[in-house]
Amino acid sequence: GVCGELNCKPLTSVVLQGLFSHLMVGVNMVNAPTIAKQRDITIREVRSDEAGAYQTLISLLVVTENQSRSIRGTLFNDEPRVVEIKDIPIDAKLGPNMLYITNRDKPGLIGNLGSVLGDAGVNIATFHLGRADEGGNAIALIEVDGTPPEAVMDAVCELENVVQAIAMRF
C-alpha cells in the first residue's frame, strides 16, 4: 500500500533502537543501525505497493536462533493500531500503560484476570483480545491506569492458562 513508497530508514532506526535499548544503554536512532551492523544482524526492508486489507501496513519480524516474533500495525483515523501479533489477529489501540498477556484460550481467564487487577486497585481502560483458534493460543493487550506493582504482575502470571504477562510503558 501507501507505505511501499515511503523512506523506511527512520522507522527501521527507531525499531532497532527499541530492540537494543533493552540490552544496552546509550542506544539511539542514530547509532542503532551501526550497532546492528557491528553485531552482524541482518536487516531487510521489504516494500510492496500491493493493495491488501489495509491502506498502510507495517510488519516487523524478528528472528533469533531460539525464536521468531512478528507484529503488524496500521493507522485507523491517524491513530496507530496493532492488527496482528505472532500471526494472531487482534485490533488494539495502544495506551501509555499496557499489559501484554499470552494465554491459552480457555473459559474463566478474563474474569480471573479482571478480579486480580480489580482487587489490587488496577483499573482496566481497554481490553483487546485475539486468538489463533478456539481453545488454542491467545493474546490480550490491556490498557491499564498506571503501572501495576510487581506483586500484581506475579499474581497475573500465576493465573491458570496464562503463559506470559508483561507490563509495557509507552
What spans do the regions from the language model cover?
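A conserved regulatory-domain signal marking ACT and ACT-like small-molecule sensing domains
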Residues: G1-F170
